Amino acid sequence: MADFLIVNARLVNEGREFEGDLRVTGDRISAIGSGLSARNGETVVDAAGRRLLPGMIDDQVHFREPGMEYKADIASESAAAVAGGLTSFMDMPNTSPPTLNNAALEDKYARAAGRARANYGFYFGASNDNLADVQGIDPKATPGLKVFMGASTGNMLVDNPETLDGIFRDTPVPIITHCEDTPMIDAILAQYRAKYGDDIPAECHPDIRSREACMKSTLLALSLARKHDTRLHVLHISTADELALFERGPLVRPDGSRKRITAETCIHFLRFDRADYARLGHQIKCNPAIKDAADRAAITRALADDVLDVLATDHAPHTWEEKHNPYVRAPSGLPLVQYALTAALECVHEGSFGTAHLVQKFAHAPAQLFDVKERGFLREGYFADLVLVDDTPFTVRREDVLSKCGWSPFEGTTFRSRIASTWVNGALAWDGKALVGDARGRRLEFDR
């Protein structure tokens, strides 16, 4: 890979926006400053005042491999990710087979090697009967342990109280949870099926997967974490109700200590609400459900106010045909990695928070939370995972979607910013119009 110098950039990093230059030597950031001069053999990239960010780290994706490659795979979805400025991803364990032991975990890493355009990590999964495997997790091998405390794909719903207690007691890595109470959901679903049959209106989804189901399950997770002093990260907060359960303040406190219990929300909870079901139907059916406009507003404020610590995508593609089945057969999940950062930048344009705050939630915080080694920041010596943002509007078109499923819930949406360039490990991966070069993603290292 060629060394290069980015000049005339507006660097966004660690709470600051400042004019400067950034040098990349090999796969690393070698210098950050002002007035840097090009060396022999260096390519000069003129940022022309555009914002230069560290690459985003998405701590929640479902790239569907192995077992569901007809709708997505590591190669296709990592391509969409780098086109969207996401340079690292952490993939969920509810594949087929699920990632419930070390052999399945290492199989995923082997699949990604040489095929992933973004850097990659894979979660270990918990089930009702793999506590011994959980106890043997290598903390350097995975970002964390995913516990589905709500309905999931495959044998991954953990609803045995003794097993849950043992998992929270014995895990050697952070626990990340999907919190919805399955019995509550099943009871409400039965009522709606009695009324509508299989073709339940999409706008009923947030009533079926209710805020009460979220709250009950989240309270259980918090109680177990406090009982065992477990490092807990609650995923995809979707309700205003849950926000009061979490500590307000920075992930890393002024004294250097960190929150033990953290929470994340996702881009679709910032950009959609109940009113959008009429237009988009099952395209925005996801678990937990997109809820009311008041929830959307409260979640946006909570992200700005440091109640929520991380922004992610929960990218979960399904085919267009699957999404147009009747409600009970239409799967939950939507493709998001390609347009997540540009969608989040709309919150910046709207004044909800600044670019530096967005970078904190979508790059710095995931790196800190999961102890990702030398990524997530613009720092000398760190890997050169970079994103150049251009404030030129564009409209999402289906023909530009890179995810294998071939559609986006943002089709027809005009965003005020676009991704001009993405670099992964010092190599250009996206030039603003097309993918560039070979897959350069590497296995994420966890500095534990």
Model regions: which residues?
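Histidine-rich, glycine-flanked metal-binding segment
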Residues: 1-55
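Divalent metal-coordination and catalytic microenvironments
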Residues: 9, 27, 49, 60, ...
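Metal-associated gating/positioning segment near the N- to mid-region
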Residues: 50-115
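Active-site loop-to-helix "anion-binding N-cap" substructures in soluble metabolic enzymes
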Residues: 66, 93-117, 126-128, 142, ...
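Alpha-helix-loop-beta-strand connector modules within alpha/beta enzyme cores
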Residues: 102-118, 166-177, 339
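Histidine/acidic residue-rich metal-binding segments in metalloenzymes
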Residues: 132-311
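His/Asp/Glu-enriched, well-ordered alpha-helical/loop segment
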Residues: 199-220, 224-229, 283, 304-305, ...
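C-terminal cap of metal-dependent C-N hydrolases
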Residues: 326-329, 380-445
